[in-house]
């Protein structure tokens, strides 16, 4: 019995380790970018006089274009160094990933039931994952 428990714990540990080994590369890229952003925030702020249009809408999923326009403005107006270049390189890779995902939005025509199923899931995401406006 004890041997079975030890084997079960060993298998659980192996599954846990392998789950981390297969972590999504985009998640790692975003985590690294957040760290770089946090580390170089003061450098990016500079003298604080740069004005960048910032969406008022809290649902950032709706403002992707505006967010990346702001990133381009920041990139063009910021003195570059090796670390800041890495930040902008990561942001560019994230933008490319999002653009590839957006191409998946186009779909073929299906019967209305399939669309209604999709619409139901879409509304569920809005209901649970989007920040409500006050």
UniProtKB/Swiss-Prot annotation:
Q: Which InterPro entries does the UniProt record give?
A: 4_helix_cytokine-like_core, IL-5
Q: Which GO terms describe its molecular function?
A: cytokine activity; growth factor activity; interleukin-5 receptor binding
Location(s), subcellular: Secreted
For biological process, the GO terms are: immune response; interleukin-5-mediated signaling pathway; positive regulation of DNA-templated transcription; positive regulation of immunoglobulin production; positive regulation of podosome assembly
Residues carrying covalently attached carbohydrate according to the record = 76, 90
- The signal peptide annotation in the UniProt record is 1-21
Among its keywords, does the record have Transcription? no
Q: Where are the transmembrane segments?
A: none
A single GO cellular-component term from the record reads: extracellular space
Highest taxon of source: Eukaryota
Described purpose of this protein according to its UniProt entry: Homodimeric cytokine expressed predominantly by T-lymphocytes and NK cells that plays an important role in the survival, differentiation, and chemotaxis of eosinophils. Also acts on activated and resting B-cells to induce immunoglobulin production, growth, and differentiation. Mechanistically, exerts its biological effects through a receptor composed of IL5RA subunit and the cytokine receptor common subunit beta/CSF2RB.
Q: How does it assemble?
A: Homodimer; disulfide-linked. Interacts with IL5RA. Interacts with CSF2RB.
Q: Can you tell me which family this protein belongs to?
A: Belongs to the IL-5 family.
Identification of the protein by name: Interleukin-5
| Higher taxonomy | Eukaryota, Metazoa, Chordata, Craniata, Vertebrata
What would be the name of the gene that encodes this protein? IL5
């Amino acid at each position: 019995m004890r041997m079975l428990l030890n084997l079960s714990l060993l298998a659980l540990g192996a599954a846990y380790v392998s789950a981390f080994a297969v972590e999504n590369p985009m998640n790692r890229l975003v985590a690294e970018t957040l760290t770089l952003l946090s580390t170089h925030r003061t450098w990016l702020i500079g003298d604080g006089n740069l004005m960048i249009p910032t969406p008022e809408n809290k649902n950032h999923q709706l403002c992707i274009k505006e967010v990346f326009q702001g990133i381009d403005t920041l990139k063009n107006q910021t003195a570059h160094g090796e670390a800041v270049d890495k930040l902008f390189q990561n942001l560019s890779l994230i933008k490319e990933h999002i653009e590839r995902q957006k191409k998946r939005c186009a779909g073929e025509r299906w019967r209305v039931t399939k669309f209604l199923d999709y619409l139901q899931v879409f509304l569920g995401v809005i209901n649970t994952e989007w920040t409500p406006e006050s």
